[in-house]
Amino acid sequence: MNIHNEQFGRFFNEFKVGEIYKHSVTKTITESDNNLFCLLTMNHHPVHLDKEYATNKTHGEILVVGSYIFSLVVGMSVKDISGKAIANLNYEKVTHDKPVFIGDTLYAQTEVLDVRESKTKSDRGIVYVETIAV
């Protein structure tokens, strides 16, 4: 019988272009989560904190801070993607296609777009990925 332990991260040679990792970690956003992130980052815009103010704006309810969503999605991918990485070198494009509200649950997945050896460090490689949340 083979017993496999859950893997935390992957080594460079384990990544294959086209592979998709559906991240098992999910997150339901609470009002406390959003409030704490606003406090920590000093983002006190009332659309993120004031229910009465937000009710009279475009979305009609409190809008969760986009940078919090970005942070969560990156965090959701760590176990599968960057757990063994030396560094996250770059984030090329961050978009928020839909608003996120208190009570929404986020799911994320990452697709491997490209894998190449480093041009400057022969013992390393670079993995290009696209991570999306739904």
Regions flagged by a language model, labelled:
Residues 1-91:
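Hot-dog-fold acyl-thioester-processing enzymes
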Residues 61-62, 85-86, 98-99, 119-122:
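Short histidine-centered beta-strand/loop micro-motifs
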Residues 46-51, 88-89, 97, 113-114, ...:
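Glycine-rich loops and low-complexity Gly/Arg-rich segments
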Residues 1-17, 100-105, 109-134:
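HotDog/MaoC-like acyl-thioester-processing domains
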